[in-house]
């Protein structure tokens, strides 16, 4: 009788609270299929355009939505945070680094042979401002930095806690 009760409890728990790892694997496979499907029908990286603030924000939102297809739900960064940072760092895409190097966040590279040198600095500077092929590529790199660098570990803890609270 005790064994039957334990089995019933285990079944109930498994039914209403599925295995976390299995759930993640299923979500990852579904996301991979969605990405493949989107690319098959011609869904491509959107172009971030600069003109008015509204245009910049709308095209940033499209880029973020596109990049979110590649990310697991728990790795996504709030749109408002990304857009606000891009507006502050690049003057809504109008800065020299945004115009010439597609860098919306002032991301640096520690390679003297790559990137852009800020005006007024000499070649002795040990870093450069990283250049990208597209503005959306700089958004991808910014998301990667927030998701991987030790400096943003506390941010990730807070995001994970909020995702848990809101069921994301």
List each language-model region with its residue ranges.
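Catalytic cores of secreted/periplasmic lytic hydrolases that degrade extracellular macromolecules
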Residues: 1-83, 92-168
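Pyridoxal 5′-phosphate
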Residues: 89
């Amino acid at each position: 009788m005790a064994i039957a009760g334990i089995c019933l409890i285990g079944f109930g728990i498994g039914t209403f609270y599925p295995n976390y790892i299995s759930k993640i694997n299923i979500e990852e496979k579904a996301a991979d299929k969605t990405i493949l499907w989107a690319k098959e029908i011609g869904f491509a990286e959107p172009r971030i355009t600069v003109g008015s603030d509204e245009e910049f924000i709308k095209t940033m939102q499209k880029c973020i939505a596109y990049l979110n297809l590649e990310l697991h739900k728990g790795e996504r960064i709030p749109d408002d945070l990304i857009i606000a940072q891009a507006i502050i760092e690049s003057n809504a895409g109008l800065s020299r680094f945004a115009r010439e190097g597609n860098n919306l966040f002032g991301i640096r590279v520690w390679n003297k042979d790559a990137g852009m040198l800020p005006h007024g600095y000499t070649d002795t500077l040990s870093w450069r401002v990283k250049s990208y092929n597209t503005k959306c590529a700089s958004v991808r790199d910014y998301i990667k930095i927030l998701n991987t660098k030790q400096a943003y570990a506390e941010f990730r803890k807070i995001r994970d806690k909020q995702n848990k609270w809101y069921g994301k």
